């Protein structure tokens, strides 16, 4: 799978051949087909593996930052900053973005798998609402608002300006301001 990931990143889904993947992995083409069936299935396995690493990272951030009893503003800010400073710069995230941004002909992850980090955050927001920490009759919408005001805006800033680092004050200010806007709406 490492060989396939490297070639899908370097060549794109369309141009990466099973022959080239097999050669890079130092196995026969038949071995690749025996293990994965077809190139599309191999591509999806690569994307799923990278997605799994992202899910673990987001789950850890949720479990360690959005803890019961912690000041909500501090918790949300710490969570947003952790995702922006640790997940965005990670090679797993960069790989995931590059693989999933490929042409429409590349196989897509199932929506349920692709949206797993968002669902985990929605579940935590449902707990926050049930505990009275936020006023959110629709925790799914609240999680989307939070993400849009913080993580998505920070990602846009990082994507728009390649010279901006995840830990720079500009990026961290986006998170803090987004948390404050979110709390004004949901507290």
Regions found by a protein language model. Give the residues of each.
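Hydrophobic/aromatic-rich alpha-helical bundle segments in the mid-to-C-terminal region
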Residues: 129-178
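Helix-turn-helix
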Residues: 3, 7-41, 45-49
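Amphipathic alpha-helical packing segments from all-alpha helical-bundle domains
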Residues: 55, 74, 89, 95, ...
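Hydrophobic alpha-helical connector segments
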Residues: 45, 58-93, 142-146
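Amphipathic alpha-helical segments used for helix-helix packing
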Residues: 75-78, 86-108, 155-160
